[in-house]
Amino acid sequence: MAPKAAEKKPSTGGKAPAGGKAPAEKKEAGKKTAASGEKKKRTKARKETYSSYIYKVLKQVHPDTGISNRAMSILNSFVNDIFERVATEASKLAAYNKKSTISSREIQTSVRLILPGELAKHAVSEGTKAVTKYSSSAK
């Protein structure tokens, strides 16, 4: 174990480190040890994407068409961006109406505000259809 900052002896070289500060102690960042002293295997951070859902929709619309990784990444970013915009707008609408819960009504209104014209109409109708299907299957 390295000595603590207070226990370190002053260097005899006469030069101070760059910046005038003593070097910070380095902590061993990726090495987590179990109580018995064994190294734990570090689990990879999970990155959730919409890739599988985008692929399923693509195969429904164009069964013989593929998609590159770059195109999938762009579509995934697009879905994340739209999701964030709708969620932010719905949150604002709920706050304006002094409500702490975002309902399907706030989502629908935020979609109408964010998406232009015909696209908003189609999105609202598909959303309503999905909510109806979910409600009927949940019973």
From Swiss-Prot:
SMART domains: H2B. Residues 11-22 have a biased composition (Low complexity). There is a cross-link at K133 (Glycyl lysine isopeptide (Lys-Gly) (interchain with G-Cter in ubiquitin)). The modification N6-acetyllysine is found at K8, K9, K15, K26. SUPFAM superfamilies: Histone-fold (SSF47113). Keywords: Acetylation, Chromosome, DNA-binding, Isopeptide bond, Nucleosome core, Nucleus, Ubl conjugation. Coiled coil: none annotated. This is Histone H2B. It comes from Coccidioides immitis (strain RS) (Valley fever fungus). The lineage of its organism: Eukaryota, Fungi, Dikarya, Ascomycota, Pezizomycotina. The gene is HTB1.
